[in-house]
Design a protein with these regions (language model features):
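A short, conserved structural fragment
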Residues: 87-102
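Short, amphipathic alpha-helical interaction segments positioned at domain boundaries
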Residues: 110-133
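Short, hydrophobic-biased segments on the C-terminal half of alpha helices
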Residues: 79, 84-88
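Long, low-complexity, charged/polar intrinsically disordered regions in eukaryotic proteins
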Residues: 1-40
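Conserved interaction-surface patches within small, structured recognition/assembly domains
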Residues: 69-80
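DNA-recognition alpha helix
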Residues: 43-71
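Minor-groove-contacting beta-hairpin "wing" of winged helix-turn-helix DNA-binding domains
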Residues: 102-109
Length: 133
């Protein structure tokens, strides 16, 4: 996944930087809340139940964003698109970790660590090219 951003106009919400549509942002944020509510770890089966509830429009939550702030709403999101556009990118970027042995999803800090490493790689490349950084 590619993250393009304008450093002078960064949104306050990191989900707006990572995900391209408001609906993706809402679903990704709800997934993280769901993981937190389940002690930061859920099984593959529970993830499938979450995706199915979204697909059937039965997932209820209270949103933090206008115009639905504070209201209980039912979210609907296609199951295939959930896996393709939300879960898979979150795994590949290090926001969520999947343990192949335990078959569980957990919240991960790898994303933050990788961004720091990318910044260091950028500085190293500039120095290698002769720039004073």
């Amino acid at each position: 996944m590619v993250i393009l951003f304008d450093r002078f106009n960064l949104p306050k919400d990191v989900f707006e930087i990572i995900f391209s549509t408001p609906q993706q942002k809402i679903v990704a944020k709800e997934l993280i809340k769901y993981l937190i509510d389940n002690k930061g770890e859920i099984s593959k089966t529970i993830m499938s139940v979450f995706a199915t509830k979204l697909h059937e429009g039965q997932y209820e939550c209270i949103l933090d964003d206008p115009p639905y702030k504070g209201r209980t709403v039912k979210l609907s999101y296609n199951k295939r698109q959930f896996y393709d556009r939300i879960l898979t990118p979150m795994k590949s970027m290090g926001l969520i970790n999947y343990d192949l042995y335990k078959k569980t999803y957990t919240i991960s800090a790898k994303f933050s660590n990788d961004l720091l490493e990318i910044g260091l790689m950028w500085k190293h490349e500039l120095r290698k090219m002769g720039a004073q950084v």
